[in-house]
Each structure stands twice: as structure tokens, then as C-alpha cells.
From Swiss-Prot:
Keywords: Fatty acid metabolism, Lipid metabolism, Lyase. Its EC number is 4.2.1.17. GO terms for molecular function: enoyl-CoA hydratase activity. GO terms for biological process: fatty acid metabolic process. This is Probable enoyl-CoA hydratase. It comes from Rhodobacter capsulatus (strain ATCC BAA-309 / NBRC 16581 / SB1003). It catalyses: a (3S)-3-hydroxyacyl-CoA = a (2E)-enoyl-CoA + H2O; a 4-saturated-(3S)-3-hydroxyacyl-CoA = a (3E)-enoyl-CoA + H2O. Pfam families: ECH_1. InterPro entries: ClpP/crotonase-like_dom_sf, Enoyl-CoA_hyd/isom_CS, Enoyl-CoA_hydra/iso, Enoyl-CoA_hydra_C.
Length: 257
């Protein structure tokens, strides 16, 4: 499949999806939203881990406000028909999804990153819930992710003041996993992603399923889910390999089964 707004690369079990409209800071237009969603579904069948990153100086500046085709659009329709499938493709993906935020992530672009399981940012990157600057409220999942990740007080401040949050501050406040010096950034995220691509895929999928369920489950239901999922993992080839590798004092060779 050919793409016009993104790049898709796969190697050694890792799919790297790059937002590729650097001339507009990788702003999201309809074509990019559709291509991202399609690429994410494709990666589920080809890869063991996924990376989302951006080309040029930005990760993603959010909705393309300069897109002539977007004039007069119905925001509710766009969110329901284009953003929701994209965000669900990230959040519900059984594979680990890593966002490598190379630069500015604003508006829906910030929330696109936050939909990932792990966010690693270059130190020069920044996050901004820019919506109120143009008379809107956070969307693209922002009102769901932000309070859960940083608490209500910080989420409210980020939304109401629409200020830039630097990568190091974002890491300190728990918005992202880590901030990395720019000079080391690509090498670092590729090493992290390779670790995920070589890892126990079924265990990673179970972690995601359990953590997501834990956001709403009462404790008894969560304990029951843990027991069921752990029982399934205990029958896996990767569990047997992990135990054998531990006993033999060698690195495990996981196959994802």
C-alpha cells in the first residue's frame, strides 16, 4: 500500500509509522487520519511493536487549520468518523505502541501521542493543549487521558491556560515516560522499541488489557482478570522460555507465542 502523508517501515518485528507533512508541522488532515488508521491496522498483522513519530521539527501540530478542504467541516462528524477510529486503533491495539515525540505536539497532536502506551520525547519537544486558544475544548481523547495521567488539577491547568509543557516537565509530572537529550533521542527510542519488538508479545497484550480494565473494574473483578490472564500466560511458550533462560542465566529468546 502506498501512502502520501505518512511513511511506513517494518524491520525485525518493528513497524515505524512516521507522520510526514513536515511543511505544516505534520498537521492532521483527513488523508493523514485515514492513512494512520490503515497503517496501524496493517501493523497489527505484520509487527510485534509499533512506533509513531514525526518528520522534521514537529511531532504533530494538531488539526490542519489551513486545510482548505476542512472549511465548514462539522467537528462532531470529523471526531466521530475520523479521530475516534484512529485513537481506538492505537488504544485497543494488542501490540505495544510507543510514541517517539521528536518536537512540538499540540492539540490533537499531543493527544495522539498520549494515546500510545509509552511516550518518549526529545528534551526540546513540548506538549500543549492548545484548544482554548481558538475557542475549543480538548478533544481526541484529551479529556479522558489527561486527568488519569496527571490528575484533575494539572489537567485543568493544561486545558484552561493552554501553555507549553516542556518534555522534562512532562516526564516529571507523569504525562510521559521519559525525556531524552536530543543528541541521543533516535538511538534511544529505537533501542526501547527493539526491546518491545523482541519481547513476550502475549504478556505485553495482557498488560495492556489488564491496565485498561483496571481503570473501571472493582478490585474483585480485577483480581479475577489477573488470575485468568496469568493462567493463560502460564501456558505460553514464552513463559517456558523465560523460566528456562532464568535458570540457565542467559537472555530469553521470546517468539511472541
Amino acid at each position: 500500500m502506498s501512502y502520501h502523508t505518512i511513511r511506513y517501515e517494518i524491520s525485525e518485528g518493528l513497524a515505524v509509522i512516521t507522520l510526514d507533512r513536515p511543511e505544516v508541522m505534520n498537521a492532521l488532515n483527513a488523508a493523514m487520519r485515514h492513512e494512520l488508521t490503515a497503517a496501524l491496522h496493517r501493523a497489527r498483522g505484520e509487527a510485534r511493536a509499533i512506533v509513531l513519530t514525526g518528520s522534521g521539527r514537529a511531532f504533530c501540530s494538531g488539526q490542519d487549520l489551513g486545510d482548505g478542504a476542512a472549511e465548514g467541516l462539522n467537528l462532531e462528524t470529523v471526531l466521530r468518523e475520523e479521530y475516534e477510529p484512529l485513537l481506538q486503533a492505537i488504544y485497543s491495539c494488542p501490540l505495544p505502541v510507543l510514541a517517539a515525540v521528536n518536537g512540538a505536539a499540540a492539540g490533537a497532536g499531543a493527544n495522539l501521542a498520549l494515546a500510545a502506551d509509552v511516550v518518549i520525547a526529545a528534551q526540546s519537544a513540548a506538549f500543549m493543549q492548545a484548544f482554548t486558544r481558538i475557542g475549543l475544548m480538548p478533544d481526541a481523547g484529551g479529556t479522558w487521558w489527561l486527568p488519569r495521567q496527571v490528575g484533575m488539577a494539572r489537567a485543568m491547568g493544561m486545558a484552561l491556560f493552554a501553555e507549553k509543557i516542556g518534555a522534562e516537565e512532562a516526564a516529571r509530572m507523569g504525562l510521559i515516560w521519559e525525556a531524552v537529550p536530543d543528541v541521543d533521542f533516535e538511538h534511544h527510542w529505537r533501542a526501547r522499541a527493539a526491546h518491545l519488538a523482541r519481547g513476550p508479545s502475549a504478556a505485553f497484550a495482557a498488560v495492556k488489557k489488564a491496565f485498561h480494565a483496571g481503570l473501571s473494574n472493582p478490585l474483585p473483578a480485577q483480581l479475577a482478570l489477573e488470575a485468568r490472564l496469568q493462567g493463560e500466560l502460564g501456558q505460553s511458550a514464552d513463559f517456558r522460555e523465560g523460566v528456562q533462560a532464568f535458570l540457565e542465566k542467559r537472555p530469553p529468546h521470546f517468539t511472541g507465542r
